[in-house]
């Protein structure tokens, strides 16, 4: 089992962390995310431009007394620590401008392709139904990741993995996804792979 490193990140209060956790708890993706009363934990797979891959997990919890977020990550992620921290905080640290409730953050996302696929899957169905479908996809096609935590063991399929499917309609259809949604995900993956669509944060 790998070790971990911990980083403390100061924020300007107030920070409504419990509300964010409640949002993510209702949408936690099986095998990828775990949310309890005090923390958000998920699998991580980072790949640099040279094709080097780092896999592990990231856990974020709030130290409200110290006005800081406590980020704990697998030591395999140390070479990409700045990217890991940035992406770990992305779902948790987008401040809302011009609102009347101090400390509110707009939930972001960790993996843009993952969240885009989940948005397609979730069209016109309930959050619960969308989570079940997404969970089946990641269980069948997601890369296995060792985290040392039961139930936290896969990453969302990469663009290349989706494109390698002989028939996405058949592959995802077996799991309950309708053809139009499968085709939409396939078209999105193709556009990303061919450089026509950039979902990177800040693009």
Outline where the language-model segments fall.
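HhH-family (HhH-GPD) DNA N-glycosylase catalytic core used in base-excision repair
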Residues: 1-203
